[in-house]
Structure formats: C-alpha cells, structure tokens
Curated annotation (Swiss-Prot):
Cellular compartment(s): Plastid, Chloroplast
GO MF annotation terms: rRNA binding; structural constituent of ribosome; transferase activity
GO cellular component, one term: chloroplast
Keyword Transmembrane: no
Entries under HAMAP family matching the protein: Ribosomal_uL2_B
Protein name per UniProt: Large ribosomal subunit protein uL2c
Family: Belongs to the universal ribosomal protein uL2 family.
SUPFAM superfamilies per record: Nucleic acid-binding proteins, Translation proteins SH3-like domain
PROSITE patterns named among the record's database cross-references: RIBOSOMAL_L2
One Gene Ontology term from the biological process aspect of the record: cytoplasmic translation
Chief subcellular location: plastid
Region (Disordered): 192-216
C-alpha cells in the first residue's frame, strides 16, 4: 500500500480540453488512480530504501525512501536498486545507481537518468522505464548528453542527474494479452482511416477493402502525414537532432 501522506486524488483529462472537446484521440476510461507525489528535486541527503512499489501513473517502479529525520518520499527506482540500499545526493555521494550528482562532476560515458533541464527545477528528462542518457562531452558551462531518442543536447553543468538507468527494463516486453487490459489503462481503440466513411476521414469510403485513393497519407484533418517536419523553430541547445524511425 502506498504511504497515505504521499498520495493524492487527481482528475485525468483523458484527452479533453477545458471545453470537453477531444484534443488527443484514443484516451478515456481506465481504472481510477491516485497520484504518487515524487521527489524530483533531491537535496543533499542520505536515505534508506524501505520498499519498491508499483505506480499506475508511469512505467517505472518507485522506491520509498526513509530519511534520518523521519521524513519519507518517493523517487524513481534505479536499475539494481533494492530494499535496504542507502542512497545519497550531493558531490560526496559515490558513483552508484540512485545517487544524485551535478552533471559537471559526472565522468564521461556514465549512464544517467532523471535529468534536470534547469538547475534546481527538478528532474524533467529520461524518466521512463529502462531509459538512460549518456554523458558524451563536457565544458565549463554545459554538459552534452545523448538522450534515448538519439538527440544530443547541451544542459547546464550545474543541473543534476541520477546515476544509472531507470529500473523495470522489461516494461517494453510486456504483452497486454487482450483488449480489456488496454481499456483498464485508459487506452481506447484506434480505428483505421480506410475503415471509416469519407465524411470522417480523407482515407474513408470505397467499395470493400481498397486503397486510400490519395497520392500520400493524410491526417484526419487533411494535412500530410508521415515524413512531414513538425518542428519549426531550431533549438540552440540541440547539437544533433534525434534519429528518425
């Protein structure tokens, strides 16, 4: 059972905006959840792992920490972290999974996760199960990281990251087994455009099973799909764009 002081109720938007209109398709329903409050911004401290818990809101597992002053908090479980381990934050910590270091002090080729984009703002990058980034270059002001997408990005050297990769690496190999498990997760069916009527999708219509009748695939709103660039503004901190599938 989760710690009562570290959970709260929350209302999921299930793909709707404030007016109730669908802005993200294929979302809705699902089992009721309670949000686990996670400590994304870890201060210099020492704590002991008291339990490893399931979190319905993310793919990673959570580690429950007990601090020496009696406080408790949740963090993402790093790969290899187990009950009874001691985790530290700060430059005095050893280079072990789950310990937090400033990027400027982390050696090259080290795997890291839960990375801050802005110093003292809290972890924002690389938080999904099994993910890790690699430190590839360092300068006095910035550290270059290779992210899971293949993108190489500069981040301020005084930002912090957690050593190691996120645990629960087998998450990507799970088999849901039936449509009902997707519905429990709040994922609604995805209908092919070619199975719709012409009024509903540019690919719709035709007699029986037939092609889309267009020179290229289109979105439900008539815009080109597959291979069209969506990022307009360049980012000065991105040294190499992510690898395309």
């Amino acid at each position: 059972m989760p710690v009562k002081s570290l959970i709260k109720g929350f209302h999921r938007s299930v793909g709707r905006n404030v007016h109730g209109k669908i802005t993200c398709r294929h979302k809705g329903g699902g089992h009721k959840r309670r949000y686990r409050i996670i400590e994304w911004q870890r201060k210099e401290s020492i704590a002991k792992v008291a339990a490893i818990e399931y979190d319905p809101n993310r793919s990673a597992r959570l580690a429950l920490l007990h601090y020496r002053d009696g406080t408790k908090s949740y963090i993402l479980q790093a790969s290899g972290m187990k009950v009874g381990d001691e985790v530290k934050a700060g430059v005095d910590a050893e280079l072990q999974p789950g310990h937090v270091w400033p990027l400027s002090a982390i050696p090259l080729a080290t795997q890291v996760h839960s990375i801050e984009l802005v110093a003292n703002k809290g972890a924002q990058l690389v938080r999904a199960a099994g993910c890790f980034a690699v430190v590839v270059a360092k300068s006095p002001s910035y550290v270059a990281l290779k992210l899971p997408s293949g993108e190489i990005r500069q981040i301020a050297a005084n930002a912090r990251a957690t050593i190691g990769r996120v645990g629960n690496e087998v998450h990507s190999q799970r088999v849901l087994g039936k449509a009902g498990r997707s519905r429990w997760l709040g994922i609604r069916p995805t209908v092919r455009g070619s199975a719709m009527n012409p009024v509903d999708h540019p690919h719709g219509g035709g007699e029986g099973r037939c092609g889309i009748g267009r020179s290229r695939p289109l979105t439900p709103w008539g815009k080109p799909a597959l291979g069209v660039k969506t990022r307009k503004r360049p980012n000065i901190y991105v040294l190499r764009n992510r690898s395309k599938n």
